[in-house]
Amino acid sequence: RNRRWCIDQQA
């Protein structure tokens, strides 16, 4: 949900 790990926690 962030900009640093949105690729993994973009759900």
Swiss-Prot record:
It comes from the Eukaryota. Induces proliferation of human neuroblastoma cells but not of human colonic epithelial cells or human adrenal carcinoma cells. Also increases proliferation of mouse neural stem cells. In human neuroblastoma cells and mouse neural stem cells, inhibits apoptosis induced by the synthetic neurotoxic compound 6-hydroxydopamine (6-OHDA). In human neuroblastoma cells and mouse neural stem cells, increases ubiquitination of cyclin-dependent kinase inhibitor CDKN1B, promoting its degradation. Attenuates motor impairments in 6-OHDA-treated mice. This is Lumbricusin.
